[in-house]
Regions:
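Catalytic phosphate/metal-binding cores of nucleic-acid and nucleotide-processing enzymes, i.e., regions
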Residues: 1-114
Length: 114
């Protein structure tokens, strides 16, 4: 990996951690490079995997996040996105998304299958 790509990845991880810290997870912090596990610490119940790449492989990223405890979320910063983490793209499984949306008051409880 080139020095520029590695620096962009670390910068993206830091931006995501700072965004989370300012938006409800005050203890969020970037793990730094070379550490195994989640990319952002201080987000109990969540497992963030942060990617700043040109290739697109969300299934692998979500599976990587699933290796850690918590709700797996892969955050992707495509090229040309700038340094605005609120515009980055987040991937999570549809079942997890619908559960979160229902908990937030959207939709209705699923019908029981008999």
């Amino acid at each position: 990996m080139s020095t520029h790509r590695k620096a962009r990845g670390m910068r993206t991880q830091l931006l995501v951690a700072q965004y989370l810290a300012a938006n409800g997870w005050p203890h969020a912090e970037s793990t730094g490079s070379g550490r195994s596990g989640v990319d952002v610490l201080g987000t109990p119940g969540l497992a963030f995997e942060v990617k700043a790449r040109t290739d697109l492989n969300p299934l692998a990223w979500v599976k990587q996040a699933e290796q850690n405890a918590g709700l797996p979320v892969a955050v992707f910063r495509p090229n040309g996105m700038g340094e605005h983490p609120e515009t980055f793209i987040a991937f999570l499984r549809l079942g997890d998304l619908t559960a979160l949306l229902r908990a937030a008051g959207y939709g209705t409880e699923p019908e029981e299958q008999g």
